[in-house]
């Protein structure tokens, strides 16, 4: 995405207002329920570690094995830790060359124990057919893969205009994989609804994306209201692939929060 950008997981809790960190502990006001939340984002096909210079010294950095080690350490403390991802899990190394045929990135998120992820702009780099093939490959692998959520795809507008071939491919793949506006997950004694949002900046940075999207903030509000009406949950979380800027007035994730 453009400029310096970070994708954040927005934790929306009625009883609690707190800044979000890479590792978050949430607790109800009465102290009755506790939840640990970990999240990743923009892993960009970096399944393997690589050698680079850090503070003048050559070091081996990155890689899913290191992330897995950290997650496993946290899960030893709390097996019911919620693990979320903010999208852009693909495109960035040679691993992307098997994006459509192996779905290596999404399957590896499953290996990490990721519960829920969403789409980033780079998931659309191989066009509609590439994303559709990747989703079907991941589903057909038979492995445990993360749930995928995005609440602001404007299917009504696209269907009114008549779905293109690419849009039909993605619609079919969404159905096969089970992509939803939101999902409900139980972690120990805590029930969490997780929704996904694809931001305006993400769309501007995805020229090969054929989908149309509704306003992310309004869609998130509407989905939260739907969750409150239909689901009995302790907490609502949103994984958003948007942008943050110094000016809070135009910073998408901060506006969404």
Predicted feature descriptions by range:
Residues 11-19:
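Bacterial N-terminal signal peptides
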Residues 1, 25-26, 190:
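Short, intrinsically disordered, low-complexity terminal segments
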């Amino acid at each position: 995405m453009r400029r310096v950008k970070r994708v954040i997981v927005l934790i929306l809790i009625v009883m609690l207002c707190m800044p979000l960190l890479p590792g978050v502990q949430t607790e109800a006001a009465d102290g009755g329920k506790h939840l640990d939340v970990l999240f990743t984002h923009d892993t960009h096909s970096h399944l393997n570690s690589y050698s680079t210079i850090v503070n003048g010294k050559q070091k081996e950095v990155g890689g899913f094995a290191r992330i897995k080690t950290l997650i496993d350490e946290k899960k030893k403390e709390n097996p019911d830790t919620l693990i979320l991802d903010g999208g852009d899990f693909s495109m960035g190394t040679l691993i992307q060359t098997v994006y459509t045929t192996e779905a290596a990135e999404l399957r590896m998120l499953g290996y990490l124990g990721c519960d829920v992820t969403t789409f980033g702009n780079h998931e659309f780099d191989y066009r509609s057919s590439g994303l559709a093939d990747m989703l079907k490959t991941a589903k057909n692998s038979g492995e445990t893969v993360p749930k995928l959520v995005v609440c602001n795809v404007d299917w009504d507008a696209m269907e009114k205009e008549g779905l293109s071939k690419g849009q039909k491919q993605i619609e079919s793949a969404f159905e096969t994989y089970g992509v939803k506006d939101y999902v409900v997950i139980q972690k120990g004694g805590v029930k969490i609804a997780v929704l996904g949002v694809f931001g305006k900046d993400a769309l501007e940075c995805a020229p090969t994306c054929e989908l149309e999207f509704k306003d992310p903030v309004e869609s998130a509000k509407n989905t939260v209201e739907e969750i409150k009406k239909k689901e009995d949950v302790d907490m609502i979380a949103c994984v958003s692939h948007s942008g943050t800027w110094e000016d809070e007035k135009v910073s998408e994730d901060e506006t969404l929060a």
